[in-house]
Amino acid sequence: DVTAGTLGGKVFQGSGCHGTNYYSRSNNHVLANSNAGQFGDLILQPGKVDGGLYPGDVIGQLHDFQPVMISTTANNIMDAAIAYTTPSDVGFATPAEGYGAPVAATVSPVMNLKVRKYGRTTRMTTGRITSINATVMVDYPAGTAQFVQQFVVSGDYSQPFSGAGDSGSLVVVNGGADDRKAVGLLFAGSGNLTAVNPIGPILARFNVQIAGD
């Protein structure tokens, strides 16, 4: 029943560049319908609101998700899920107007780090990390959930870094020696502020690596 979101690239399990299992990564609330999804649920790309139809636009099946604890005292650290996909159906690079492919490495969020993302709604945007180790409250259909150890991005030029439908976008470093290294997974926003899950715990939770350059 989820209508719109962003696939935040491709990840794999296995060793080297030839992973044994490939998955698309996004948010729980995008791929798993805010805890209501069932393993094996079909994933469409594009989503229903963008004209996606069964069976022609099916690209995979829900494989796993981290449940979001609906509580204002919870210690959620991610809103994340993965869907099993056939490698030929989903690439790991952004569209031509994006930043290309992420680097198959990660960095931890630090203050004032320049970042960018490519998402379904606002496409390519840039910003800076303006808060780390943040605690944020996010509304879900079942109630409000608290997230801890998050980071916050402010869009450049007083413009929003994200909009509705950008959830699931991979946030990467913008420029410098760490250009295109993954920093986090976008999951919520309000006005010019966007909340992001650090990428490290997500990769560890699902035992996956980023597919990229």
Predicted regions and their residues:
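Serine endopeptidase catalytic core focused on the charge-relay Asp
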Residues: 1-155, 162-164, 172-178, 183, ...
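Short hairpin/turn module used for nucleic-acid contact or packing/dimerization
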Residues: 163-213
